[in-house]
């Protein structure tokens, strides 16, 4: 296991630890109503989306789909991970999303209903993306088999990108699905929008999964609305004061280790677990200095934008100094949350060749336009690829250009 020098916690970490119990206070006490209201809000903020409330399905209005013959892309899972995945329903991303209750997979019948009744009839196939958790794999898998029995052409891609639980402990279950799943959705949604066939969409989706590594860290476990305050206290005490948990899952699953360190020390440990090829238990993807990568810094939910920016800065600095890696694209924000968790996830995607030709590289697909409320409005590919001046003009240069004033002090 990767190790690092231990430091005293920085003031920011102390502040978050002291206020973590505030996460047990919520505006809504009924979790079922909270889920339905949140799903309905998507139809308010995205007029092209519809809600099947009985089955908790958000789907695109058929009249909003310009090419109904294209492959449909469906994802889903438990609620509480907003904006993933209902917030990704829209042009260039998902055709539909099937939601469960908080941190619980939707039922197989919900999935079957979505595949049979909530997608364009002319679609040349359906790509279903499920995160690698037992309930999701089981229920989405059963829903897919039911749809196939009805004559639907369906492919299932299971997304697992976590390195927090190594091979020895994960066994045949494999890696848990984390924020890297958002990149799988983005790539597959862009391919489907370009009219690529189902087999190639599924092939590239699995290619993305195979080249993803993600790792989370959190200062506290989250409290689910509707559950007792005592449970929140127990969760907090389980972690212990002054500690950050590395490898914590998005459903409060325990991590791989608890450390007392500052941000640079934490990032050093995390990147080592993600990229160290000598760690045979976690070396899932070989990434060399010559490889192109994309970086996603994902917010669990309650890390401030200020602190998330500082985390991004530290990760990029250490990637360059320690590994000789410079991300071709960087996305920062909340894509796959964990309610109000005070944590973050680092996801790194190795930009390998899709073998689909011009305009269909992973970089092209990440850059492709998307029209959904949950996908961040990023700067353009042109902005990323333009070479700019390395540094601003020195202050002294401006001073020399400024004419002296004739004003005199009295």
Predicted regions and their residues:
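N-terminal loops that bind phosphate or other acidic moieties
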Residues: 4-410
């Amino acid at each position: 296991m990767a190790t690092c020098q231990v430091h005293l916690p920085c003031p920011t970490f102390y502040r978050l630890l002291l206020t973590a119990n505030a996460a047990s206070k919520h505006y809504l006490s009924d979790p079922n109503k909270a889920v339905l209201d949140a799903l309905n809000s998507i139809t308010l903020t995205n007029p092209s989306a519809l809600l099947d409330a009985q089955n908790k399905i958000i789907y695109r209005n058929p009249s909003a789909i310009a090419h109904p013959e294209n492959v449909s892309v469906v994802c889903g899972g438990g609620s509480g991970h907003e904006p993933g995945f209902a917030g990704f329903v829209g042009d260039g991303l998902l055709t539909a999303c099937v939601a469960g209750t908080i941190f619980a997979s939707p039922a197989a019948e919900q999935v079957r209903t979505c595949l049979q009744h909530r997608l364009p009839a002319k679609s040349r196939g359906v790509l279903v993306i499920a995160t690698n958790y037992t309930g999701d794999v089981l229920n989405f898998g059963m829903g897919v088999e039911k749809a196939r029995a009805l004559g639907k052409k369906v492919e299932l891609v299971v997304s697992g990108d976590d390195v927090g639980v190594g091979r020895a402990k994960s066994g045949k279950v494999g890696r848990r699905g984390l924020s890297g799943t958002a990149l799988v959705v983005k790539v597959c949604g862009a391919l489907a929008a370009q009219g690529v066939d189902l087999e190639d969409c599924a092939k590239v989706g699995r290619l993305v999964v195979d080249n993803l590594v993600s790792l989370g860290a959190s200062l506290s476990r989250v409290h689910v609305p509707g559950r007792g305050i005592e449970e929140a206290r127990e969760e907090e005490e389980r972690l212990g004061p002054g500690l950050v948990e590395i490898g914590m899952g998005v459903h409060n699953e325990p991590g791989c280790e608890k450390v007392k360190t500052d941000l640079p020390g934490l990032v050093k440990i995390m990147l080592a677990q993600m990229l160290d090829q000598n760690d045979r238990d976690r070396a899932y993807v070989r990434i060399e200095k010559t490889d192109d990568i994309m970086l996603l810094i994902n917010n669990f939910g309650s890390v401030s934008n200020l602190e998330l920016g500082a985390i991004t800065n530290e990760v990029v600095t250490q990637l360059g100094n320690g590994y000789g890696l410079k991300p071709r694209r960087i996305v920062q924000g909340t894509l796959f949350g964990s309610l109000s968790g005070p944590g973050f996830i680092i996801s790194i995607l190795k930009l390998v060749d899709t073998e689909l030709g011009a305009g269909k590289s992973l970089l092209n697909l990440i850059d492709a336009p998307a029209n959904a409320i949950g996908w961040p409005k990023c700067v353009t590919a042109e902005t990323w690829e333009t070479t700019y001046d390395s540094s601003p003009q020195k202050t002294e240069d401006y001073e020399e250009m400024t004419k002296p004033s004739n004003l005199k002090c009295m």
